[in-house]
Amino acid sequence: MPEQNRILCRELSLLAFNRRVLAQAEDKNVPLLERLRFLCIVSSNLDEFFEVRMAWLKRENKLHPRRRLDNGKMPSETIADVTEAARSLIRHQYDLFNNVLQPELARESIHFYRRRNWTGAQKKWIEDYFDRELLPILTPIGLDPSHPFPRPLNKSLNFAVELDGTDAFGRPSGMAIVQAPRILPRVVPLPSELCGGGHGFVFLSSILHAHVGKLFPGMNVKGCHQFRLTRDSDLTVDEEDLQNLRAAIQNELHDREYGDGVRLEVADTCPAYIRDFLLAQFKLTAAELYQVKGPVNLVRLNAVPDLVNRPDLKFPTHTPGRLKALGKTASIFDLVRQSPILLHHPYQSFDPVVEMMREAAADPDVLAVKMTIYRTGTRSELVRALMKAALAGKQVTVVVELMARFDEANNVNWAKQLEEAGAHVVYGVFGYKVHAKMALVIRREDGVLKRYAHLGTGNYHQGTSRIYTDFGIITADEQITADVNTLFMEITGLGKPGRLNKLYQSPFTLHKMVIDRIARETEHAKAGKPARITAKMNSLIEPTVIEALYRASAAGVQIDLIVRGMCTLRPGVKGLSENIRVRSIIGRQLEHARVYCFHNNGADDTFISSADWMGRNFFRRIETAAPITAPELKKRVIREGLEMALADNTHAWLMQPDGGYIRAAPAEGESEADLQNDLWTLLGG
C-alpha cells in the first residue's frame, strides 16, 4: 500500500465516532429522552471539534501549507475533506431532530412549539415572559460609527436585527446586534396547562424573534436572524515570558472567548446579504458557514430530559456494587494491606477511593497525602478531604493540571482553595500535561512508614465515575507505591527521571514499553509461537505504534483493538493488517478505560493505564501504566475489560479498511451479548 494511505485522517475518524454516537439517537431501542441526550452530546462534541481540531488545521494551513499531515494530505486538502464530512453529519443531525425526534416526542406529549403554532394563551404567557425575564436584561447595539460591530463571545447566541426608520436622535437605522446572555435558558418550559397537560417548550430564539421590536421602540423590524460564532479555543502560554502559570492561565481564559473564528452558524432562512455581512465581520469564507434548519445550538436541548418527569422515557437507574469487605473492617488500609482492591467503575462504586482520602484526612497515623488532579468537577469530596487533611496539619501535596482543556477555570479555583487550606499545590511540569491519575497516602504503622497508592485510568471525578467506564487499583505493593512516590518527586522537584520498579511512565518509558511488547509478540509469531495483542483505549493515532502493529500483523500476530474514538490504523488490509481487528463500543456508558494485554507465551502481561496510544500521551504528557499481576485481578481485567468487549454484538461497531464502521449484530442462532448490561449484572448492586 502506498505510504500516504497507511494512516487515516484523524479528524475524519473523530467525525466517524460522532456518527456512531448519533446512531444512538436514531436507535429505537434507546429510551426516547436518552436519544435526545445523545443528539446533544454530538452537538457538544462538534463544538469542541471546531474549537480544537478545525482550528488546528486552519493554523497548520496558515503556517505550513505544503507540509503533509500523517494521512499523507496537505492541510488544505484535509480541511476540504473534513468540511464536507462535518456538513453531512450536521445535516443528518438536524434531519433527525426535526423529522424523527420531534414527532416522536410529540406523540409522548412533549412539544417544541414554533411561533406559527402558538395559541393565544401561549402567546400571552410568552409575551409576559419576555417583558419580565428578557427585556430588562437584553442590550441592543445599533451599528453606526460610534457603535462598531461587537465581539461576540465564543459559542454565544446572537441576533442580527434589520431595522427601518430613525431613532430618538434622528439617526437613520440599518442594523443592530442583540446578544443573548449565557445565563438565559435557551429552551423555556411552558406551564403544563398551556400544553394540554403535557410538556411544552419554546426556544429562546423564537421568543426573541417574536418580541425583538420592543427593544427598538418606534422602529420597524424588517428581519431578525440568529447566528453563533465558534472560535479557536486553544490556550497559548509563552514559556519565556512566564512568571506565574496560574495568572497566565486566568488571562488566557478571557482571551479564549475572543479567539479567531472557525465556524459561523446561521438559520437556513438567513438572507444571503446578511450571511455575507457576518462572514466579512469575522473574516471567514463561505466554506466556514453552516446553515442549519433549527436552533443554532442543539447542545442546550440537554436541559429537556431533566425538566420532563418521564422515567419510562429514560434509562433505568443502576446501583453500583459496593465492596462487602469494606463494611466488615474498620479501616480501608487494613483491607488493602491484605490484598489490592480492583475497582471497575461505574459498575462498582467510586466510594472506596473517596473513603481512602477521607480516612487519610482523619487518621492521626497518616503523615502525608499526595494526589494529581486533572478533572474533578465543581464539587469534589476528594478535594474537600485533601483540604481537611491539610487543615489537620498533614503534609498534603496536590499536582493540579491547570491546562486540562475546558476545565482550566475549575482547576484554578480548586488550586486557590487548596493553597488557602495549607496544601502544597504545584502545577506540574511546564510543557507536559499531568494526565496520570495517582494518589499516595503515607502512614505510620508499628513505628515504620507504610505507603498506599491508588492508580486509575480515569479522573478523580465523582460525577464522571458514574458515567465513564474506568479501572482503578488501590494497593500497598511496596514497589508500586515506591514508584508512585518517585513520580511525585519528579513532578514536584528537580532532577533526572528516577528508576521505576514496576510502573511505566510517559514521556520516558511508556512508548518504548509498548513498542518493545509489540516487537516481542512479533518475534514470537515469527518463531511459530502463539502471539496475541489485545488492547482497549479511547484513541489510536500514534504512527510508530501503528507501524509496529502492521509489522506484527504481517508476522502473524493476532491483534484485537477496542478503540472507542479515533483510530487512524487501517484494519483488515491484505498484506498490511489482515490480522488486525478494530471495534468500537458505543453505549449508555462512555468507554474510557485503557487496558493493554500482551500474550507473552501465555504470561498475558496486562496493564491499566491513563494513556491512549497518541503522540500527546506518549511524548507531551505525564502518564502511567501499572501492571496487574495478582492472578484474580488480572483475570478480572482481561475478562471485564477485553474479552466481554470482544464478545459484544449489540453495541459494537466493526471498523472497515476504509475507516468506515458496520454495526455488529448477533449471528443466526447466536444470543445477544451486551457488554455494559452484562457488567451491571455481574458487578452492580
Curated annotation (Swiss-Prot):
Amino acids binding ATP: 45, 468, 564, 592
One Pfam family per UniProt: PP_kinase_C
Known EC number: 2.7.4.1
Catalysed reactions, semicolon-separated: [phosphate](n) + ATP = [phosphate](n+1) + ADP
Gene3D superfamilies reported for this sequence: Endonuclease Chain A (3.30.870.10), Polyphosphate kinase middle domain (3.30.1840.10), Polyphosphate kinase N-terminal domain (1.20.58.310)
Family note: Belongs to the polyphosphate kinase 1 (PPK1) family.
Record organism: Neisseria meningitidis serogroup A / serotype 4A (strain DSM 15465 / Z2491)
Physiological role: Catalyzes the reversible transfer of the terminal phosphate of ATP to form a long-chain polyphosphate (polyP).
Protein name (Swiss-Prot/TrEMBL): Polyphosphate kinase
SUPFAM superfamilies found in the cross-reference section: Phospholipase D/nuclease (SSF56024), PHP14-like (SSF143724), PPK N-terminal domain-like (SSF140356)
One annotated GO molecular function: ATP binding
Cofactor(s) listed: Mg(2+)
Gene: ppk
Keywords, sorted A to Z: ATP-binding, Kinase, Magnesium, Metal-binding, Nucleotide-binding, Phosphoprotein, Transferase
Protein residues bound to Mg(2+): 375, 405
A GO CC term attached to the entry: polyphosphate kinase complex
Biological process, per Gene Ontology: polyphosphate biosynthetic process
Residues annotated as catalytic: 435
PTM remark: An intermediate of this reaction is the autophosphorylated ppk in which a phosphate is covalently linked to a histidine residue through a N-P bond.
